Amino acid sequence: MISLPSLRLAFATALFCSGLAVLAPRAQAAVQLPTGFQDQVLASGLDWPTGIAFLPDGRILVCELQSGRLRMIVNGELAAIDPIGIVDSLATSGGEQGLLGVVADPRWPSKPFIYTLSSALDATLRISRFTAAGDLSDGTSGNLAIVAGSRRELIRDIASVTEVHSGGTLRFGPDSLLYVSLGEDAIACTATDTTKLNGVILRLEVRGLPDTPGPPNKPLLAAAGNPWVTSANINRRLVWEVGLRNPFRFSIDKPTGRLFIADVGFDQFEEVNVTSTGGLNFGWPYLEGTTTFVTNECGIPAPPGLVGPSFKYARTEYCANNCPATIIGGVVLRSVPNSTVTFPASYDGRYLFSDYYTGFIWMLRDSSGTWVKAPVVQGQPSTADWARGYAQASDYVLGPDGAVYYALNGYDFASGSGEVRRIVHDNGNVGLAGRAASRVEFAPVYPSPSRGSASLRFVLPRAARARLAIYDALGRRVRELQPEASLTAGEHLAVWDGRDESGRNVAPGVYMARLGVDGQSFARRIPLVR
């Protein structure tokens, strides 16, 4: 999938020549969207946010790849308890290891469980469950945290010896079963060996597990209807699909139950596999796209019945010199009635995905079972690209409001430059990225953490009396940036230089920016480091 700059050049070169994805540092390009759409930031200052998921009450979970932190976004900002937990004992070398994915139990709040996929220090991947406590039913509360000692291991023996091709997504289907994508660990012949749990999609029954912490119990995870559920081999009982290389991101369309699996290719094709049927073999390593890759791997000839992709794209379609590519699976769009940010109903059933390197978003539609490019809409940056500027996006989810939410790893590998953002359609409510807002908008502090300078942006929907000041952790005012005064409608920017009223540098720590507007109060945290 992705690689951090800590990779040594020789190792990176070797990976690239073998066809694996290696990320070259680059700045984020400007976002280009069709007419009527906007891209908005929800939370900034994150360290390599890799996976996101919604709680059923609308709060957003975020997992950071190498820190192991689980963070939560509430009402457009990081929760008061931050992080809500840390997944420890992570292997983080190489750049594709760490905390890869997160999802919440759909039975929340009666079953307040959070599931993760992570790389462990013993060269394995682990699927774990944690219990949360706090305000479980209040979607506006930041009072939520992982209970210490609540970890239950579901599976902890998935091989991860090569530091790459780990997979990374967990999603619940409309059948309440947990689906998990796992890469082939850069050992191609494991992708067709259903006893290895590599290069597969798992389908797990978690409702029979005890609510308490404990070790794995694989027999309880075997879901009825799995294609090999009667096998004598316990691993085979858990497998839903096989023959995948690195299905880093997939999504499930809840109305239809179909899986949209984005599988990262070797050096020719990236592909999307659409399925609602278990037991399929998507062909790796015998096929890359629809092209024969090998006829025999590890002494095993290609089996019959291989299934080609629902959609594929060649690197040569957008780069004559066969540049790097990594498909990032997106979501199937579903409009939400009365939402001011939902995609229009004309987009219903369409599937969007992006490429981690080039940053394009493509839009697909179902044409009698064949997935093809959707018709061009007004304002697209090109006939091929529905949008541009999404390099380093690492995960997408469809929000309960019909907007598309995504995690952005970061800009040019800068620490703390990761963000969670969303793509919205302007249905009468425009936030920070567009015209004057219909309510006061106070953007997250940038950068976060701040090193001597913090930018504070806010938007007033109309002329109002406003005041902006900085306070320390004890509630003492440190600096007044904007004395109370009448300000015009529109966007305003203030910069705090990390000094107090006397011009002295303040000590490192967490400070609070408080914005008052006509009796209303808004706040943003400023982590300050030196």
What are these regions (language model features)?
Residues 32, 68, 97-99, 107-109, ...:
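Beta-propeller domain segments
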Residues 176, 402, 470-478, 511:
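Short, glycine-anchored, charge-dense loop/turn motifs used at functional sites
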Residues 426-446, 461, 477-478, 521, ...:
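Residue-level detector of functionally pivotal "anchor" positions at catalytic/ligand-binding pockets or at interdomain
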Residues 41-47, 84-94, 155-161, 239-242, ...:
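Surface loop/turn motifs at the tips and blade-to-blade linkers of beta-strand repeat domains
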Residues 30-46, 147-151:
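A short helix->beta-strand "capping" segment at the edge of beta-propeller domains
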Residues 454, 480, 485, 495, ...:
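C-terminal tail/sorting-segment detector
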Residues 126-171:
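Asp-box/WD-like beta-propeller blade repeats and closely related beta-sheet repeat scaffolds
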